[in-house]
Amino acid sequence: IAQFEDEYKADAVFIDMGYGTGIYSIGKQLGRKWRLIEFGGKSNDPVYLNMRAYMWGQMKEWLREGGSIPPNDQALYDDIVGPESIIDKNGHIQLESKKDMKDRGLPSPNKGDALALTFAARVVKKSETGNRIVANTSYNPF
C-alpha cells in the first residue's frame, strides 16, 4: 500500500478496519498517516445507518454527478449494482447485508466496497511537498 501511495501520490489512504488492522499497524510504524475505517461504525451523515451505507451513498452521488468506472470492469459494475438500499424502521438508509446478498445468489461486493472506501471522508489535496494545501494568505478581520 505504501508503494502505491507513493507511486500515485495519494492524498489519503483509508483502510478497512475489518481486515486491515495489521496493515495499518505496519503503515503506522513506517510513519504513514493512514486511517482505519469501521464499515459498521457511525456514519458521517445521520441519514445513513452506518459507515458502509454512507460510503456507498457517497459513491452513488459521485457516479450520478459524472464519476465513472472502467467500462471493461464487469466485476466492479456487478458489485455496484448488486446490493439493495433499504430504509430501516427508524428511517435510516441501510445497505443490504452480505448474508442477504448471498441468499439471493450474489457474491460479496469486494471491489464495490473497495471503491466505496475511497468515499469514507473528504480529502484535502496535498501540495507537491506532501503537505496539505492551505490558504497562502493571513486572515485579519481588523
Name each model feature, range by range.
Residues 77, 81-142:
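Acidic two-metal-ion nuclease catalytic site recognized across multiple nuclease folds
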Residues 1-92, 136-142:
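Mg2+-dependent endonuclease catalytic cores in nucleic-acid-processing enzymes, primarily RNase H-like
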